[in-house]
């Protein structure tokens, strides 16, 4: 071999060696995921109980798992309670808070609508629904509900406050919305 052939063959050999090394290093990690009796990649689901007790999981991940499992169980319990007692405003409001925290306001509105069918003049349910409508940016509908609730109880400071906030969010300031105290 002359020196010209060595200059061409050395980089070519190095390139081939790199490709082989890359292929081997790519396949080895995948081989660790496959089982011998089944050559495809194996996926094994781990139960929530096993995850909660696992020592390899760091504390932050364990907290997220606990929160997710707890929220799901709490939501199921509240929904079951509402199925048995459709007019349970306390359970509806707790479920509504959980759904809004999970960024599911449409479901929260459905829960409150179902409660309002059973107890149409409940101030807490009307207020909760109006608050969610405000969160969604539907201020006119929210203000209508606040006014409806204020007709039932004109002295309720929470309803007055929430109506003022709704008007402020919308950029309005109406004095006619507030009933005059005598």
Curated annotation (Swiss-Prot):
Q: In the UniProt record, which is one GO cellular component term?
A: membrane
Q: Which UniProt keywords apply?
A: Membrane, Plasmid, Repeat, TPR repeat, Transmembrane, Transmembrane helix
Q: Which residues form the signal peptide?
A: none
Per its UniProt entry, which superkingdom is the organism in?
Bacteria
Q: One Pfam family of this protein, by short name?
A: TPR_19
Give the matching InterPro entries: TPR-like_helical_dom_sf, TPR_rpt, Ycf3/AcsC/BcsC/TPR_MFPF
Q: What is its main location?
A: membrane
TM stretches of this protein: 17-34
Its membrane topology:
Single-pass membrane protein
Classification via PROSITE patterns = TPR (PS50005), TPR_REGION (PS50293)
| Record-linked SUPFAM superfamilies | TPR-like (SSF48452)
Give me the TPR repeat coordinates as residue ranges: 89-122, 123-156
- Cell location: Membrane
The name this protein goes by in its record: Uncharacterized protein y4yS
